[in-house]
């Protein structure tokens, strides 16, 4: 398992939380605009993401990155303004068999 973020503080929290839960998790600082480390390790069995589309550039970068990672993709999105752009791209150019949209309130 590899947990990533671009913020150094988040990387430290990822490592600390894994240790507190008795888990071994590799952590890495990764920028989606420089995805080579993730792509070299592909294909991934499962890609999990939560609240990733908080900036317009994230939607574009993720849309370019995710097809190269392989495996299943599960994203949790709270309804950010840029999520529609991201979803529209994958409805036009699917990266998998299914896209489900679930609303949790």
Where are these regions (language model features)?
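S-adenosylmethionine-dependent methyltransferases
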Residues: 1-105
């Amino acid at each position: 398992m590899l947990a990533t973020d671009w913020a150094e503080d988040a990387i430290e929290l990822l490592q600390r939380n894994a240790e507190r839960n008795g888990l071994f998790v590799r952590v890495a600082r990764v920028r989606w605009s420089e995805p080579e480390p993730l792509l070299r390790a592909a294909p991934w069995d499962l890609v999990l993401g939560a609240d990733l589309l908080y900036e317009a550039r994230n939607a574009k970068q993720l849309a370019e990155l995710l097809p190269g990672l392989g495996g299943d993709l599960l994203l949790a999105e709270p309804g950010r303004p840029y999520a529609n752009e991201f979803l529209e791209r994958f409805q036009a150019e699917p990266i998998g068999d299914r896209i489900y949209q679930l609303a949790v309130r």
